[in-house]
């Protein structure tokens, strides 16, 4: 017989164990925010953090996102608030609500909100995510290697697809709440309805180049699902028996090593982990397996590895799981091969359901270049990047094609049979972002993050012929890891009677002084004057620019110096073979959205009726490759359109990005 005090003590300890997950996961404030509201019921919303408030707060995305993140944080860090804001907040007084029923409504709402954090399956999903995070950090490694694991985007994509689908099918009543939690955990912002529908799909296909860890990544997914999700049934199908056997043994080994406290059995190609009331199982089979079949099974997750090489008879059996509402089928395979019978999944590219994800080193616009140009091994738009552990060069290409014609494009690069003859280097997305998304560089909130050095590149031209070259001038600064265009000029001499050196220098100085007037935070102006045409004129231009700036502004002015024939440093820059590297660097950053224009951009020589950014875009669109005897160079000249301005912008960004501070000196 137990005493009353003992019963109470045991009950409290039992409840503490049962709801431990709730205390770990839920950080919802239970303090009632008592404030009066004076609007109609249809305009009222109720949240744990704000209490009763006006529904327009749902449209204030930063506020709503902040509340959701705070809701799921396990260890809240103290927030830093500006003293002025804190003082103003303390001055605000809220009238208490006159209706006492509001507090009881809030309490009931909060209690219903906590249901998610008490749900056993939610705690299982949260445990899966915690274990995966520990594995990524290297905490499950017993051999002293604590290096973090860096996942590729396609691996993160697979992980998100798996856990989202399980959450939606296992907890349909709380699906939206679970999804809000998972978007926070995976740090996915701006998730729209279309993205969620894609994640909820029953079937997804991932085509990835070889040697990228497709099968390697499947092992921890199966292991942690078996350990955390009670009653889950997983199926794994490989194209060959030895592959499925290897994966099974890897899963068994990892489970026994990482979860020694669990009861793990491996019998008849099925791994089982015993939980308190139910078992979690994973079945491993191959399309040639006569002893273990997936027929008649019921899976929550079915993974089909190297799907392109699965026997057609076995494939029809796999497709039989499509009508099963609670089954997620993941097809994972090498990207492509030259044989149409082993590349049939590429047909899903035209599917309206967005079920196909393809990883490739080359985009569709430039796939043809790998065949046309002998040493080409990368996408010329430089939008797609290969991992550091993958080494691809001309020797790899030649060797692969010697063994098997077309093997490089199909087996290594992940390309598909492509008839596209487009050779566009600049993407539409990059053009649109450059044209419409511009920073206000006089905004006080942005200024602390802007670079304090202004780089000016000047490419002088000594002609008044507007059909020929003009003088291109570009002023560039930095914002974190991005580049901002502060000013641009495309100057043509009015006549050959004009003193060209003086006119060009005054044009550049006028632009620089205007930029400094608007942006007084600059501490140094670094000027690069191209001297390929006339070195003597370049030196004279440098002297005139310095005289003009120092007469009007108290700021340090330095020039890029190059040794002349007598090894004496002169204030000019000789453009050489680095032009190719500079253009490639520009294309990569432009297509990645790292180059922006200032809203307060300065330009005196481009017509008032013409937007300078649109003017620059016309030249940017003209950038194209020129291949002569397997040597690749770039040009933006087309018909009557010159490339002076864009070359100045490209070189200014290239010099700005490099470690060339030692080359800048005063004169």
From Swiss-Prot:
Signal peptide span: none
Transmembrane spans: none
Active site: 306 (for atpase activity), 459 (for nuclease activity), 530 (for nuclease activity), 644 (for nuclease activity)
InterPro entries: DNA_pack_C, DNA_pack_C_sf, DNA_pack_N, HSV_TRM3, P-loop_NTPase
Subcellular localization: Host nucleus
Domain of life: Viruses
GO cellular component: host cell nucleus
Pfam families registered for this protein in UniProt: DNA_pack_C (PF02499), DNA_pack_N (PF02500)
EC number from the UniProt entry: 3.1.-.-
GO molecular function: DNA binding; hydrolase activity
Motif position, Walker A motif: 208-215
GO biological process terms on file: chromosome organization
Motif extent (Walker B motif): 301-306
Assigned keywords, A-Z: DNA-binding, Host nucleus, Hydrolase, Viral genome packaging, Viral release from host cell
Coiled coil: none
Principal location listed in the UniProt entry: host cell
Broad class of enzyme this protein falls into: hydrolase
Family, as annotated: Belongs to the herpesviridae TRM3 protein family.
Function: Component of the molecular motor that translocates viral genomic DNA in empty capsid during DNA packaging. Forms a tripartite terminase complex together with TRM1 and TRM2 in the host cytoplasm. Once the complex reaches the host nucleus, it interacts with the capsid portal vertex. This portal forms a ring in which genomic DNA is translocated into the capsid. TRM3 carries an RNase H-like nuclease activity that plays an important role for the cleavage of concatemeric viral DNA into unit length genomes.
Complex and partners: Interacts with the terminase subunits TRM1 and TRM2. Interacts with portal protein.
Official protein name in the record: Tripartite terminase subunit 3
Species of provenance: Human herpesvirus 6A (strain Uganda-1102) (HHV-6 variant A)
Gene expressing this chain: TRM3
């Amino acid at each position: 017989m137990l005493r009353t005090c003992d019963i109470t003590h045991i009950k409290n300890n039992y409840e503490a164990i049962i709801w431990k997950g709730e205390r770990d996961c839920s950080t919802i404030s239970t303090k009632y925010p008592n404030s009066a509201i004076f609007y109609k019921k249809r305009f009222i919303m109720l949240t744990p953090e704000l209490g009763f408030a006006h529904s327009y707060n749902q449209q204030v995305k930063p506020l709503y996102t902040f509340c959701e993140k705070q809701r799921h944080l396990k260890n809240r860090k103290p927030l830093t608030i500006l003293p002025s804001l804190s003082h103003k907040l303390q001055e605000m007084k809220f009238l208490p609500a006159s209706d006492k029923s509001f507090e009881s409504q809030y309490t009931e709402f909060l209690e219903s909100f906590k249901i998610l954090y008490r749900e056993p399956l939610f705690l299982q999903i949260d445990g899966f995510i915690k274990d995966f995070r520990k594995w990524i950090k290297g905490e499950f490694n017993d051999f002293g290697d604590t290096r973090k694991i860096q996942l590729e985007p396609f691996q993160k994509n697979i992980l998100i697809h798996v856990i989202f689908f399980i959450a939606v099918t296992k907890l349909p009543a709380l699906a939206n709440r679970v999804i809000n939690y998972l978007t926070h955990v995976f740090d996915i912002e701006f998730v729209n309805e279309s993205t969620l529908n894609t994640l909820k799909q029953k079937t997804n296909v991932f085509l990835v180049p070889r040697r990228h860890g497709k099968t390697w990544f499947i092992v921890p997914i199966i292991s942690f699902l078996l350990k955390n999700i009670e009653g889950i049934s997983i199926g794994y199908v490989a194209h060959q028996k030895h592959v499925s056997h290897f994966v099974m043994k890897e899963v068994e080994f990892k489970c026994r090593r990482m979860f020694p406290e669990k009861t793990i059995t491996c019998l008849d190609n099925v791994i089982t982990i015993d939980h308190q009331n139910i078992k979690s199982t994973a079945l491993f089979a191959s399309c040639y397996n006569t002893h273990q079949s997936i027929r008649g099974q019921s899976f929550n997750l079915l993974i089909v590895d190297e799907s392109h090489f699965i026997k057609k008879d076995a494939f029809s059996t796999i497709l039989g799981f499509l009508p099963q509402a609670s089954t997620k089928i993941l097809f994972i395979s090498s990207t492509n091969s030259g044989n149409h019978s082993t590349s049939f999944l590429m047909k899903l590219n035209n599917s309206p359901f967005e079920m196909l994800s393809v990883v490739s080193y080359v985009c569709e616009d430039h796939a043809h270049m790998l065949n046309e140009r002998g040493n080409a091994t990368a996408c010329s738009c430089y939008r797609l990047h290969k991992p550091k552990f993958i080494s691809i060069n001309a020797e790899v290409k030649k060797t692969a094609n010697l063994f098997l014609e077309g093997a490089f494009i199909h087996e290594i690069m992940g390309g598909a049979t492509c008839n596209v003859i487009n050779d566009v280097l600049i993407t539409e997305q990059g053009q649109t972002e450059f044209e419409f998304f511009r920073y206000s560089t006089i905004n006080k909130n942005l200024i602390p993050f802007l670079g304090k050095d202004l780089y000016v590149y000047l490419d002088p031209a000594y002609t008044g012929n507007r059909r020929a070259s003009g003088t291109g001038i570009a002023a560039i600064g930095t914002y974190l890891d991005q580049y901002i265009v502060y000013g641009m000029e495309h100057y043509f001499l009015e006549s050959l009677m004009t003193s060209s050196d003086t006119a060009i220098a005054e044009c550049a100085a006028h632009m620089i002084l205007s930029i400094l007037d608007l942006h007084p935070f600059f501490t140094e102006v670094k000027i690069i004057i191209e001297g390929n045409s006339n070195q003597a004129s370049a030196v004279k231009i440098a002297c005139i620019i310095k005289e003009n700036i120092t007469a009007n502004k108290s700021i340090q002015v330095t020039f890029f110096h190059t040794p002349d024939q007598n090894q004496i440093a002169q204030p000019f820059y000789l453009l050489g073979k680095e032009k190719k590297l500079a253009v490639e660097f520009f294309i990569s950053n432009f297509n990645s959205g790292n180059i922006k224009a200032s809203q307060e951009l300065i330009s005196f020589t481009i017509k008032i009726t013409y937007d300078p950014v649109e003017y620059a875009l016309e030249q940017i669109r003209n950038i194209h490759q020129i291949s002569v005897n397997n040597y690749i160079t770039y040009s933006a000249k087309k018909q009557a359109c010159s490339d002076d301005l864009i070359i100045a912008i490209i070189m200014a960004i290239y010099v700005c990005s490099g470690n060339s501070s030692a080359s800048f000196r005063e004169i």
